Amino acid sequence: MSKDPKNPGVELNRTSLYMGLVLVLVIILLFSNYFIN
């Protein structure tokens, strides 16, 4: 548990967080298209 600001673990966690947000947005778009049609 180093306090290095360039810790790869923090970057990996941030990347996974952004990927999760993108995945949720894609799912919302798919469901909205499904319900509109």
UniProtKB/Swiss-Prot annotation:
Q: Where are the transmembrane segments?
A: 16-36
- Annotated localization: Cell inner membrane
- Membrane listed as a keyword: yes
| Signal sequence residues | none
Source species of the chain = Gloeobacter violaceus (strain ATCC 29082 / PCC 7421)
The entry's function note states: One of the components of the core complex of photosystem II (PSII). PSII is a light-driven water:plastoquinone oxidoreductase that uses light energy to abstract electrons from H(2)O, generating O(2) and a proton gradient subsequently used for ATP formation. It consists of a core antenna complex that captures photons, and an electron transfer chain that converts photonic excitation into a charge separation. This subunit is found at the monomer-monomer interface and is required for correct PSII assembly and/or dimerization.
Give the UniProt keywords, A-Z.
Cell inner membrane, Cell membrane, Membrane, Photosynthesis, Photosystem II, Reaction center, Transmembrane, Transmembrane helix
Q: Which family does it belong to?
A: Belongs to the PsbL family.
Q: What is its main location?
A: membrane
Cellular component terms per the entry's GO annotation: cytoplasm; photosystem II reaction center; plasma membrane
Which stretches are annotated as coiled coil?
A: none
Asked whether the keyword Membrane is assigned, the reply is yes
- Gene name, please? psbL
Q: How does it sit in the membrane?
A: Single-pass membrane protein
Query: InterPro entries, alphabetically?
Result: PSII_PsbL, PSII_PsbL_sf
Q: How does it assemble?
A: PSII is composed of 1 copy each of membrane proteins PsbA, PsbB, PsbC, PsbD, PsbE, PsbF, PsbH, PsbI, PsbJ, PsbK, PsbL, PsbM, PsbT, PsbX, Psb30/Ycf12, peripheral proteins PsbO, CyanoQ (PsbQ), PsbU, PsbV and a large number of cofactors. It forms dimeric complexes.
This one is known as Photosystem II reaction center protein L
The organism's place on the tree of life at top rank: Bacteria
